Regions:
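Extracytoplasmic/secreted envelope proteins and their assembly/folding machinery
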Residues: 77-85, 96-100, 113-117, 135, ...
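Active-site-adjacent substructure of cysteine-protease-like catalytic cores
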Residues: 131-187, 193-194
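Bacterial N-terminal signal peptides
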Residues: 24-37
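Active-site-adjacent structural segments surrounding the nucleophilic cysteine of cysteine proteases
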Residues: 37-110, 154, 162, 178, ...
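Noncatalytic regulatory segments and standalone regulatory/sensor domains
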Residues: 42-50, 166, 175-239
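Bacterial N-terminal signal peptides that target proteins for export
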Residues: 4-26
Length: 239
């Protein structure tokens, strides 16, 4: 299905007035007015404006986890787990393709947090799954250098009241905070960290899985020993 933008006035009248236009050019303009819709888990991109941008260097408490990018509208869970595993152990360099298969992610059901937890545990990680978390819980984990996977409502195809929305669940990683903001690694956003004002984050911090409400959900994945911890300052030689 295609969503159509408003096209020039030339196409809002009767096309028989424009028989002189070559058919190839006409088709080009028609398709130029069409864009594919983006739905689901965090691929509905919105253009950033100067007012929306902030500098990571100005955030006093920020964990620099690897930036990962989901390749489809149902693999946000895959991408956040990929980031977290590599963050804790740089030898756990799993490709998205591998994790999609291991986690059995699919377009209908997305990625199950329970499957994510089971996979992490099978690799020797400690996993703590919580609901009913508080903002202070998030802050305390971040203060100790531990990012938190959260489920929020985000990237809806149309304007919605996220406090009442349960249909646009999205995985992100809470990695930082300041007085009025929470910062994230959001796999729907290429190359940059993201943020939400605290009040808005709290309104969005919920989801539903197979009929079960997940309010203030958080998943904490840790290594008992962090010998190969990810360091964004490292630059590797190509082999």
């Amino acid at each position: 299905m295609w969503r159509f933008l408003r096209c020039p006035a030339i196409f809002r009248g009767d096309l028989h007035h424009f028989r002189g236009i070559q058919s190839g050019f006409l088709l080009f303009l028609l398709f130029a007015c069409a864009i594919p819709p983006f739905t689901g888990c965090g691929t509905n991109f919105q253009q950033k404006t100067g007012q929306e941008l902030r500098s990571a260097s100005a955030v006093g408490n920020l964990i620099h986890v690897p930036l990962t990018r989901q390749s489809s509208d149902y693999t946000c869970g895959v991408a956040v787990l990929q980031s977290i595993l590599y963050f804790h152990d740089a030898q756990d360099d799993y490709s998205e393709e591998t994790l999609v298969k291991e986690l059995k992610a699919d377009p209908v059901n997305g990625t199950s947090y329970q499957t994510m937890a089971d996979f992490a545990r099978s690799k020797g990680y400690l996993v703590d799954i919580r609901t009913g978390m508080t903002l202070n819980d998030i802050r305390n984990f971040i203060d100790n250098g531990i990012p938190v996977i959260v489920l929020i409502q985000a990237w809806a195809e149309s304007l919605v009241d996220y406090s009442q929305d349960w249909e646009d669940g999205h995985y992100a990683v809470a990695i930082g905070y300041d007085r009025d903001t929470v910062y994230f690694m959001d796999p729907s956003t290429m190359g940059n960290y993201t943020y939400l004002p605290i009040r808005e984050f709290l309104d969005r911090w919920h989801d539903e899985d197979k009929g079960v409400k997940l309010d203030r959900f958080g998943m904490i994945i840790q290594r008992e020993k962090r010998e190969n911890h990810y360091d964004p300052d490292n630059i590797f030689r190509i082999r």
